[in-house]
Each structure stands twice: as C-alpha cells, then as structure tokens.
C-alpha cells in the first residue's frame, strides 16, 4: 500500500515522504490515526507544493535559528535551587527549568523539547546545556546552578 506521511513516524519517515507499507499497517494504524493519507496523483502534487513551501520556510528558519544561537552564545544563565549540605539538589533541574532561567536572564523564548540535558543535573555547579534550534544549528548555554 502506497501512503503519504502527514506526520513524523519513527522508523518510517517524515511528513511528505511517500512510503510503501503493508496493507494492514496502513489501513488499521497509519490512516485512522491520521499519520498518513493514501497516495493519489492529486495528493502527490499537493505534497510537492508543500515541500517547496517548507524548503523556503526552512531557509528563513535557519537564519532565525542562527540569530537566536548568537543571542544564547554570550548568555550566562544562573539557576537557584534548594540543595542539601553536600551540594546535592532536592530533585533535579529539568529542561523546563532551563527554559525559564534563560527567559529570566533576558534570553529568547525557547521550546523545552529543544533543550537537551545529556545527564540529569542533580548537584550544584556549572553545566553546559545544548539547545537544538534547527537541524543544522545547535547552541550551547552556560548554566550555573547555585543554592537558594
């Protein structure tokens, strides 16, 4: 069965991709959940138009992502959190906490899903946090966790 994906499907493809899947998988899972539509000639033409518009938008988004990366590059973010005697935090610092601290420090609004914490932040100290702004642009934020 030939389908056009409307959403990202792990292991299968991204929106706009034309994929060949088993009939049951397409009919019982992908189409009812609106992850895909049937691949007709009209739908394929429409997908090509959408892809052209998306590529033009991606160029604009790349410039915007580079601008935000420049803003984040020189930003030092301080986050205060409750901690015990040995510097161990009560809980941990989450991506949402990092976004809130960046905004409070005068940085741009970020999406918490774009913030990557490679290891959980569970103690006081200095950390480097990666922010994926665009597939080609990743910014780093210097985060200082201090005791409240």
Swiss-Prot record:
GO molecular function, one term: rRNA binding
Any Pfam family hit: Ribosomal_L9_N
Species whose genome carries this gene: Frankia casuarinae (strain DSM 45818 / CECT 9043 / HFP020203 / CcI3)
Record's keyword terms, sorted: Ribonucleoprotein, Ribosomal protein, RNA-binding, rRNA-binding
Gene Ontology biological process terms in this record: translation
Cystine pairings recorded for this chain: none
GO cellular component terms, semicolon-separated: ribonucleoprotein complex; ribosome
Protein name, UniProt field: Large ribosomal subunit protein bL9
Taxonomic superkingdom: Bacteria
Lineage start: Bacteria, Bacillati, Actinomycetota, Actinomycetes, Frankiales
InterPro entries: Ribosomal_bL9, Ribosomal_bL9/RNase_H1_N, Ribosomal_bL9_bac/chp, Ribosomal_bL9_C, Ribosomal_bL9_C_sf, Ribosomal_bL9_N, Ribosomal_bL9_N_sf
Protein's UniProt keywords contain Ribosomal protein: yes
Function of the molecule: Binds to the 23S rRNA.
Family: Belongs to the bacterial ribosomal protein bL9 family.
């Amino acid at each position: 069965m030939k389908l056009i994906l409307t959403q990202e499907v792990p292991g299968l493809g991204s929106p706009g991709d034309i994929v060949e899947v088993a009939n049951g998988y397409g009919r019982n899972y992908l189409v009812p959940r609106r992850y895909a539509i049937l691949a007709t000639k009209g739908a394929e033409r429409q997908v090509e138009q959408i892809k052209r518009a998306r590529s033009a938008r991606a160029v604009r988004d790349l410039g915007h992502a580079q601008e935000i990366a420049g803003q984040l590059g020189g930003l030092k973010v301080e986050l205060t959190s409750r901690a015990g005697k040995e510097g161990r935090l009560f809980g941990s610092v989450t991506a949402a906490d990092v976004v809130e601290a960046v905004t409070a420090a005068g940085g741009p609004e970020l999406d918490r899903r774009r913030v990557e914490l490679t290891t959980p932040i569970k103690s006081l100290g200095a950390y480097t946090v990666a922010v994926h702004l665009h597939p080609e642009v990743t910014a780093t934020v210097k985060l200082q966790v201090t005791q409240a």
